């Protein structure tokens, strides 16, 4: 049975209240613009929610996991088996993302989108498998086009479940050995860049491995050149099961007027695809950080994004997105709680 095409209806964020929101920010007891990027973040959140008192409710970190056929060629510092081991680590609470989520108050959910071997009977892992790892993209498509739509449908259901609990902010992380290769290929295809401008060292590969990674991604783009006719086709030819479901979940979250917090290089590649499918998604995206991966800055610039943090992170998992949550909450809190000049009886400062 074929999967019917999944589409999303995403409204642009209204600009009707933009002037009044900006005026409220300007009249807080501070010089104009003195809270820097927190001010533009507060403006974005207030516009999305269209409320006098914006708020963060049930913030949820979604970590999508999947394996990649190209990893068998040795493009990473670790073999594919590490994907499964790390997913188990997430489930047992022992990874960096677990530590940070506990610290900042994120609910964490781990989604198996298609690691090589499923993990049976472990609480906290959501089964949304699209297969047992993707095809090796330098030899064949990563997946069928129908699989992309199946992944989008699963992702929409996932977001709907969280939306029903009152969640209004979702953050996106991932785990998948080889997924920087898939993300680099997606970036090159959509942004029409040379591979060398998109490929980096991932979690820390040496020069020899980097050269092999470059060659294989070049081969993949050459192999699928005629099939890369749209963003879904790019995902089918070059993507990963976790990247597909991240893309679909970002689209679904924007459709539900939720705040979407984007982590690093892989998550930004998913955001790039989502914005290509539905440009209005861009209004809902909050970019957590600029990672150490060399292509990430180029993608952020392409998306006209100014990330909140720059910490030299290159771990993935959603770690940067988790660390950004206190800043997002701070933007909401100053908007709601900080006195205006008239409230405080202070003469306005320009």
UniProtKB/Swiss-Prot annotation:
Name of the top EC class for this enzyme: transferase
Reaction catalysed by this enzyme: 5,6-dimethylbenzimidazole + nicotinate beta-D-ribonucleotide = alpha-ribazole 5'-phosphate + nicotinate + H(+)
UniProt keywords, alphabetically: Cobalamin biosynthesis, Glycosyltransferase, Transferase
Entry's EC annotation: 2.4.2.21
Keyword check for Transcription: no
Pfam families for the chain: DBI_PRT
GO terms for biological process, alphabetical: cobalamin biosynthetic process
Active site positions: 317 (proton acceptor)
Record InterPro entries: Nict_dMeBzImd_PRibTrfase, Nict_dMeBzImd_PRibTrfase_bact, Nict_dMeBzImd_PRibTrfase_N, Nict_dMeBzImd_PRibTrfase_sf
Disulfide bond sites: none
Family recorded in the similarity comment: Belongs to the CobT family.
Function: Catalyzes the synthesis of alpha-ribazole-5'-phosphate from nicotinate mononucleotide (NAMN) and 5,6-dimethylbenzimidazole (DMB).
PANTHER family: NICOTINATE-NUCLEOTIDE--DIMETHYLBENZIMIDAZOLE PHOSPHORIBOSYLTRANSFERASE (PTHR43463:SF1)
Protein name, entry field: Nicotinate-nucleotide--dimethylbenzimidazole phosphoribosyltransferase
The organism's taxonomic lineage, starting at the top: Bacteria, Pseudomonadati, Pseudomonadota, Gammaproteobacteria, Alteromonadales
